[in-house]
Amino acid sequence: MAFFHDHRLHPDDPRREGVLNRYSENLKDTFDALTESNVPVLVGSVVVNERDCPPLGSLHPFGMSDDARSDFDAIWNQALNAEARDDLISAINFLKKAMEIDARFAKLHFRLARLYERTEDLTSSRFHYRQAKDCDALPFRASSAINVTLKQAVESVASTSIHFVDLESYLRNHPSSMNQVPGGAFFYEHVHFRFNGDYTMASYLFPHIQQILNLPRMEPGEESVRLLELVDCAKELGYNPVLEAMMIQSMIQLQKGPPF
């Protein structure tokens, strides 16, 4: 992790495009091999914590002048001061002014998302949460481009055995996602699911698995009866408060080191 912290990538770094291209090629090769072996496949979009995980890295563009950096920092501090005195509109306006200097600075978008959320402009808030993720200079969270590439790879394969499941859209529209932004209700930190997150994903995938394997199914309206409730599922798996505390402790230890 410390290595990555010293090798951050600006969101417009051309190497990112190279990674996406190789990712797409690898996906298609994998799908071809699975299709030849008659293996049914479910491919889910990648879900990450947008709301409750600030960007792990923010970078100004290479070659940004010292004057521009100085102007950006001055406006940034004005925004922080405005927010500190609860002048949210002024804070937003200062940050929008800073965006005119650098519109790809990740933590600027995250702060804007929080401010817009507090002023109940939820459309703008959602936009900037996503921008904060996509501009993260330490992209441990899957970007929007990753999921677009994933879906396009599935659509490019001429096979009825490869199925795409839009887990991201499902989680965005889940009642536990505040303002349609996945967050701490499902994740410990940037990507690792809480038990509730695992349960939510598994419950949504269940009927898709039945379908792709041609398993017998009840009527759609009755299908949910077969699913255990969260508490009962935890009991069957032996997941208890002690294990939950151990998970939380391990996540606390994880976040004491880089890149956090």
Locations of regions flagged by a protein language model:
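Helix C-cap/helix->beta junction micro-motif
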Residues: 37, 157-160
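Serine-dependent acyl-ester chemistry module
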Residues: 1-152, 170-177, 182-184, 207, ...
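Hydrophobic/aromatic beta-strand patches that form the interior of the parallel beta-sheet core
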Residues: 42-44, 160-165
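Accessory beta->alpha helical hairpin/"wing" motif in late/C-terminal subdomains of nucleic-acid enzymes
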Residues: 193-196
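Pore domain of cation channels
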Residues: 187-190
